[in-house]
Structure formats: C-alpha cells, structure tokens
C-alpha cells in the first residue's frame, strides 16, 4: 500500500478567482492498494453543488454565467486534473529537479491537450462525459502509433532519478542518504510503468466504462430519482472528507473514487451492463474501495437478477389483467350474463390477488387514508408502534385560511412573516400546508424516505433536520425539490416537536446546499432564530384536518403520495406531493 497525493492545482486558482488575489495551495491525499487506481466521475462540483453532469453540453453551461466563471479554469486545464488524479505526484512535485523536468517535458503537452478538447467542447455538441473520455485517451495515448509523450517523459525522469541517486549531497548523513535512495528507487520503479501501455489502456478503458455508465444513469432516471441518488452520496464525497469546509465551499472539483480497475472491468465482462450500472450507482452512493470485492460484486449481480425477475413477473401480471379486462368488455358488449369463462377468470383473478398480497408482505406497506373532518384508521401497528411526534403551532397554523394565517402572523413574534400580503401567504400555503407528510414521518419505514442531515444548535436549542426528495404538482406546475422537516425535543418528555415543515423548490444544482448539516444558507434563511417553546403542541397522531378538507395518502413501492382533492368534486386533484423512496444501498 502506498500514499498518493493529488495536486489540486484547480483549488489554488479558483481560490484566486473567487476569494482573493493571494494564491492559496491545497492538496488531497488518498490511499491506493495494489491494482487500484483513481477513476474520475464525470460530475463537477462548485462547493457543495453539482454544476456539470455527464450529459451537460457547453450550450447548457452558457445559460448560467456564474457556472461559466467557476468552470473556466478547470475546463482549460482538464488534462492537468486527470494527470494529477492518476499519477503519483511524488515523481513530479518535489519542488526541485523533478518538478522542473515536468515543466519542461510534460506541462506543455498537457496544456495542448486541454486547449484542444476545450475548443472541441465549445464549438461542438459533445457532453462532458464524452469530453472526459477524450482527455484520458489523449493524455495516455494508448492507441498511438508514435512514441507516447508519457513514455518519453518517463525516460527523462528515470535518467534524472539515476543522476540524483549518484550525486547525493556530501553533507547528508548515511541515514538520510539511505532514506533518499529508497524513495528515489521507489519513484524509479513507479516511473517504469509509464512504458506499460497495457496498464494505462486499462485505466482509459475503466474511465470510459464509468463515464458511459454515468451518462446512462442520468438519461435513464427521472430528474427526482437522479437528485435522490446524488443527494445520498453528497455527504460521502472524498474531497469533502479530506479538505476543510471553508476550502471546499470555494472550490471547483470533479468527484472521483479509488477502485480496483481490473475487478471492475472483469465484473463488466462477466455480468454485463446492468450490473456495471448498479455498481457505479453504489459508488456514487458512497461505497468505498475496501467494500468492493468479488463477493460484493456477486451480491450486486444477484440483486440485479432478482429485480429483473420481479419486473418480468409484474409485466406478466399486468398483461393478464389487460386480457381479463378485455374479456370482460367483450362479454358486456355481447350482452351476455356471466359465463363460465368469466367466472373462471374471476376465480383466477382472486387467486392472483391473494398471491400478490403474500408477495407484498415482503415489503413494508402503508394503507391509504382519506381525511375529511375525521380520520379513518386502518391497518395494524408495526412491532414497537408508530413513531410519535408533536406539532408546533407555527406548523399547524398553515392549515387555516389565508386570512386567519395573516392575522396570526401579524400578531406573532416572527418578523419575517409579519406584514405579508394575502397573495404571498396563499403562495406559501401551497408549500407549507403539507401535514399529510406526518403520516409518512410517523410510519415505521420513514427512514426509507427521509435523510437525516444532522443535528445543529441555533437560538439556544438543539435541532434536527430531515429531508426527502419530492415533486409537488400544483396549479399546472410540476416542481422538483425537497420536503424539509425541522424538529427539536420537548422537555422533559423528549418527544420530537415538528416546528418546521415545508416543500422547498430546488434543482440538482442547488441540492448540495440544501443537504448540508443545518441546511446551509438555504436552511438558515427559512429557519427560526428562536423557537417559541410555549408547550402549545399537538400530538401528530391526534391531528385532524378541518371539515371539508380532503386528502389521501398512497404508499407505493418507490414513492409516497399525498393527494389533495376538491371537496366539491373528488375527481379533481388540486395538489399532489410525491415523495421519492431513497435509493437502495446494497
């Protein structure tokens, strides 16, 4: 095992652009095992936010002036970033002779590669995923018929290292000379691999596979599903763990993973694209190198196989149901009474329904509920009972009419709500009047939907914040975002009190700030400085909507829906909030 250091030159320059005129330097360190290599994901972050996806074209970037400013340096030096991630920096970043040799023999070549691919990106229609693959191909030149620049640079490095071994300073002690000799010999051995075209061909092949898979994932998922996938991994990023908060917040960087590339390539050849896609998803979710071995790959392959089997079975059931419905329609059209064939079909439908109920028992299900002045309790409590929450009056207030809400806010202590117009309150009621979320929050499997972003202290109270990815449909608009739940513990009972509940509209780009502990700037903007702990809480289990208000909660395999209907016309949907299930971690 050896330490490798990625020289993050992009950090220094972005700090100059965004922070001050004083240049700063930073580096990220990581450990690689024999056979392991750093592979870059085709995602670019600015601070905690994703600004470039595998599918992003240059024309997409031009719409966001700030992103263009932040990305200018990285895109102009993409080959340097790839080199820094891939090559052990101890062989070219010693602050002396080896670094000068890199400047003389390699820097100009990498500059040329970067400028060429940037020109290609600006003037063409390639995605960032395709661009990154081209950078790898041109940097390592594995298919070149000419002498590779990397190999020529390696020859110069070996000669320089040999000279350094032979001409050690006389004033050094024998112990110091021995250590220096050992380090230089290790570097020499590593540099010899620059001639190993097959090794670097594998690196390029693995990078291409990961880039193409990431692009497939982005194209194959709904935006909210992709947002959920990236949100889960946002707290597990390598660079976030290696660098400080202030350093990360002003940095442009690509995400990467350390992985055994031979293992990854073998898995792709043996199991195919579906298993590779799931493996890459798990890496994006935060699966680390030491967790990925042959046994784990087999586990992923079995999970993919089982998912495929269930999907095929579900399709088969739907086809049978369509055939039965078609047969019923024909029978009605002919005006016949129930025939033997229809009875048999009914019996078959009943049997299949019973089978479905048994199979559904494998997953946690929650019954639908309709609320219209009274709660209809159905289903059994899970072992240990449902989770208990209390509701703060500032959350309960949103169930009232806009006029009543305005009256109470104007008399209240929260300045940010005082003086709001009725129109503003009506707009905000759409995002805050989502009490049906408590049905999910209290359920035994709430953790399958909500992510805990951590505890933090504000206004003298310790608080917890949870978020879930969702889609809110209202007034003909479909809005992507997160459901935010803020709680604190009631004293002395210790029962969590929900004091903040809302749907926040945000896209993939702004998701990083939303996911930060304490909510980052976005969370702080909506958070209450000091909570009015007046004990006027209501037990969530006893909450009942006012008469005339109707909503239904529907729990499905991958989502939870709250549907608000028109009391005068139940077929008319006024609003629908769909909360996505968190992606499965294998």
From Swiss-Prot:
InterPro entries: DUF3654, UPF0329
Superkingdom assignment: Eukaryota
Ranges of biased composition (kind: Basic and acidic residues): 344-353
SS bond list: none
Acidic residues bias locations: 354-368
Span list, region Disordered: 326-386
Pfam families linked: DUF1609, DUF3654
Sequence ranges of Basic residues compositional bias: 330-339
Similarity section: Belongs to the UPF0329 family.
Full protein name: UPF0329 protein ECU04_1670
The organism of origin for this protein: Encephalitozoon cuniculi (strain GB-M1)
Lineage of source species: Eukaryota, Fungi, Fungi incertae sedis, Microsporidia, Unikaryonidae
